[in-house]
Amino acid sequence: QFLANPNDFTMRVLWPRMTTGLQPLADMQPFYSIGPDPILLGPALAYEEHVRMLETLKQLAEASQASMQAEADYVDTMQELGYPVSYGANFTPPFDVVADFLRGLRGVMLDMFREPDKLLAAVELYVEPQIQAAIAWAEAIDNPRICIWIHRGAAGMMSEQHYKRFYWPSLRRVVLGLVEAGLTPIMHVQGDYTPRLPYLAELPRGKVPIHYDRVDREQALEIMGDRQCFWGGVSSALLSTGTPEQVKEDVKELIDMFGPKGGLIVDGTVGIPDEAKPENVQAMVEAVREY
């Protein structure tokens, strides 16, 4: 049903499953069957439950406007204080959309064995729309840096054989599409990505900063070299439970390894966790400036 008509499935099946506020959509007839004249939408939407749904959507739009304005004000304030915004637009890659919102983790794992062609077709449907949506978002907020949150492709999630077939091709096309559009995709790879380094090395040199959650530093240096900017490196555990001295030693090791080749952003592996000790965060900054 999704492959036959993704728009209709999303509106009349998926969204009503996710929220009771859109349940009336499940009972509506397909828009094309209402007729070509838009005035016929009136009778189709005249039911009391549909009117309530439209009011809910209006409230959603107003809340979204307020949220986006608050975010824009925050960005302006931080920039005035001297803190640049690393990225604005962000999304998850095509396979993860299918896994997170359509099939579930168990579903896609079974699909790779039982319905591989249908799974690939579903993933394929999201490639070009994601590229175009990301480009439009980046232009709207005037920030060319886009973060791609990548999680289902980690080493512990699937074999290399399945990664090569189901995950990497669509992700690669999305990344290349953004690069070709003059944007800077930032790949935040969650989980252990050491076995995936040879794939990341295929990307255009110097175009895709990669923020690692977990990776073998020596292998990253050997395989990636100076191809892409290494982002992260300081573990959440160290920032949360270590000492300032340990943090500084870790940062110095990072700089010794990746600094000579250029392209290093020292950061927490998943950013700065809420549990991080303030003195450890300060030590990380001081180590970069001192060393």
Regions found by a protein language model. Name each.
Residues 1-291:
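Catalytic cores of TIM-barrel enzymes
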